[in-house]
UniProtKB/Swiss-Prot annotation:
Protein location: Cytoplasm
Name of this chain's protein: Chemotaxis protein CheA
Gene for this chain: cheA
Basic and acidic residues bias: start-end ranges: 128-150, 268-286
Modified residues (Phosphohistidine): 45
Length: 671
């Protein structure tokens, strides 16, 4: 039966791990925030329960270890530090590897010793803990084999409900001592309520009075609690005797005892605030539950099948339109127009179903940036914007690695160490921005840093050294042409190779991935100001609007999303400047390429009048010269397969309404 729920378990576990990572990153910025500590604790507690239910004992055990560490932080026994979070993050990474192993092999055995890790982090937490400032003395009592009790004498003020505060204060006025006791049972303890009853029995023997328990006595009797119970006690005996008595009870992992020397009643305002907060949280939960209830999980394969069928419908519609043009059957015009509208609406709905927020990609990066910056001894303020920007799920699967490389480059090459930034008059903390937005029919993703920028002179020297250009050619290059050398395979300006970057691989791979998605990439950089890398992707790779053009009676398709403008030109409009053909549009010089020359196909004598399709690739423009324009159409992109994967000029093919094939021009691959 469990196999049926494995997919749901994996999906939900990944979501919890992502939320846990985000919470821990926030906790590092606000280590005293008890709400964040509680949130992380609850996430691990839920993960532990899910893993236990599915029978993944190693994962459940590891979650329990991390849960206990955060529980100590909740009880102010230890403080959250960056070093402690390093250990917790390492544990979260182990859980992630377990999930990957569960997906691939159905087992959570990752070949790593969980006990060793658990002992290490427990030891670190104990040795590195900082005692709260208000605690004066602390004594420990140990059983014969292991530590069970901790007793704390402190001047601690506890905020309690009015009735409890009144009782404890009255008891102190009469000379009694008042204590806060936390009993933690061992994991897997049977008959938990019976063990807590033994605690009550011991307290009764010592003539102690239990004023309040958390959870309630009824919940304890029904075992509606995990492994912890909190008590407020009035006692005639001192802390040491209490600790000695309670530590002797079997199956108790630990007892924490604090003497309460002052109590404070909740004010009316506090009560109202708490009530309001609870109401708000209840409303938030109800709203979240409402949203969840309106969503369903759909297998990706089913979405792909739906998209394929949608594509076939678009092709069928185009063929019907083509047939009607030949026979001019007016009676069918209205029906066909209605069919076209329905097809278009259906197409838009299917496209939206495939869209997912880019946060699915972005959310993995804050943790990576934090770890890498710390490893390289740099301080980085990482800002993400536009995480709710939606794009086709195909891009989500493909764009992650290129963005990862760009972020690593920014931290390694771009952002300077603290001392260097101060010497330059910059803020000591570097800024790294990852943003996404919709721009027309494109998704624009930018990676921007305020680091040292790219040394263009260094790029030119390296290009000359590699024999890519000579010195005379170098003098004529624009800034953009210089920066484009970074996309040449094996090109790197970094002298010293690090394990992060500088191995001469990466940017060419980034460019190849982006262009395989019919996208474009460009770089802007200013020395000592920073660098910005911009990626432009079409909204979808499935069905696109394209301009059909003709060259030598062959039909090609150019994606509308890449087209800036279209104009008719004559042979005389094309000028030769610095060994390249250009045209001038409203004072702007734009390079042009004859499509037949780019594709190396035979062409009849150049026509007096031709069409120039001006396309935009990143922040560059150029013109594609063709014989004629055939109009705009919705086309379904079909892959050319592995055999033609090296042909950069084409990004795919499409079946037209008359059954013929049109190759789709990859505007990034022409230049």
């Amino acid at each position: 039966m469990m196999e049926e729920y494995l997919g749901v378990f994996v999906d939900e576990t990944k979501e919890y791990l992502q939320n846990l990572n985000d919470t821990l990153l926030e906790l590092e910025k606000n280590p005293e925030d008890m709400e964040l500590i509680n949130e992380a604790f609850r996430a691990l507690h839920t993960l532990k329960g899910m893993a236990g239910t599915m029978g993944f004992s190693s994962m459940a055990k590891l979650c329990h270890t991390l849960e206990n560490i955060l529980d100590k932080a909740r009880n102010s026994e230890i403080k959250i530090t960056s070093d402690l979070l390093d250990k917790i993050f390492a544990g979260v990474d182990m859980i992630t590897r377990m999930v990957d192993k569960i997906v691939s092999e159905g087992s959570d055995d990752i070949g790593e010793n969980i006990d060793v890790f658990s002992d290490t982090i427990k030891s670190f937490a104990s040795s590195g803990k900082e005692k709260p400032s208000e605690i004066k003395n602390e004594t420990e009592t140990k059983g014969e084999e292991e530590h069970k009790g901790e007793s704390t004498s402190n001047e601690e003020v506890v905020v309690l409900p009015e009735e409890v505060a009144h009782v404890l204060q009255e008891a102190r006025n009469k000379g009694f001592k008042t204590f806060y006791i936390k009993v933690i049972l061992k994991e897997g303890t049977q008959l938990k309520s019976a063990r807590i009853y033994l605690v009550f029995h011991k307290l009764e023997e010592l003539k102690c009075e239990v004023v309040r328990t958390i959870p309630s006595v009824e919940e304890i009797e029904e075992e509606k609690f995990e492994n912890e119970v909190e008590l407020f006690v009035i006692s005639p005996v001192d802390l040491e005797k209490l600790s000695e008595a309670l530590s002797s009870i079997a199956d108790i992992e630990r007892v924490i005892i604090k003497e309460v020397t002052a109590v404070t009643e909740e004010s009316g305002a506090e009560k109202r605030t708490e009530k309001e907060e609870k109401t708000e949280k209840t409303e938030e939960k109800a709203e979240r539950k409402k949203v969840i209830s309106q969503t369903v999980r759909v297998d990706i394969e089913k979405l792909d099948n739906l998209m394929d069928l949608m594509g076939e419908l678009v092709i069928a519609r185009s063929r019907i339109l083509e047939t009607l043009k030949k026979y001019n059957i007016k009676e069918l015009d209205e029906s066909l127009s209605h069919l076209s509208r329905i097809t278009l609406d259906l197409q838009n709905v299917v496209m939206k179903i495939r869209m997912v927020p880019i946060s699915f990609v972005f959310n993995r990066f804050p943790r990576m940036v934090r770890d890498l910056a710390k490893k390289m001894n740099k301080e980085v303020n990482f800002i993400m914007r536009g995480e709710d920007t939606e794009l086709d799920r195909t891009f989500v699967e493909e764009i992650g690695e290129p963005l990862l490389h760009l972020l690593r480059n920014a931290i390694d090459h771009g952002i300077e160490p603290k001392e260097e930034r101060i010497a330059k008059g910059k803020p000591p903390i570097g800024t790294l921005i990852l943003s996404a937005r919709h721009e027309g029919n494109n998704v624009v993703i930018e990676v921007e840093d305020d680091g040292r920028g790219i040394d263009k002179e260094k790029i030119i020297r390296k290009a000359i050294e590699k024999g890519l250009i000579d010195e005379s050619k170098a003098a004529t290059l624009s800034d953009q042409e210089i920066l484009n050398f970074l996309f040449v395979p094996g090109f790197s300006t970094k002298e010293k190779v690090s394990e992060v970057s500088g191995r001469g691989v990466g940017m060419d791979v980034v460019k190849n991935v982006v262009e395989s998605l019919n996208g474009s990439i460009s770089i802007e950089s200013e020395k000592d100001k920073g660098t910005k890398v911009t990626i432009r992707l079409p909204l979808t790779l499935a069905i696109i609007q394209a301009l059909l053009v003709k060259v030598n009676n062959l039909v090609y398709a150019i994606p509308i999303a890449n087209i800036d403008t279209i104009l008719s030109i004559s042979k005389e409009d094309i000028q030769r400047v610095q060994d390249r053909d250009v045209i001038v549009i409203r004072g702007e010089v734009i390079p042009v390429y004859r499509l037949w020359e780019v594709l190396q196909i035979e062409h009849k004598e150049e026509l007096e009048e031709m069409e120039a399709v001006i396309v935009r690739v990143g922040n560059r423009k150029y013109g594609i010269v063709v014989d004629d324009l055939l109009g705009q159409d919705d086309i379904v992109i079909k892959s050319l397969g592995k055999v033609f994967s090296e042909v950069k000029e084409f990004s795919g093919a499409a079946i037209l309404g008359d059954g013929s094939i049109a190759l789709i021009i990859n505007v990034s691959g022409i230049v």
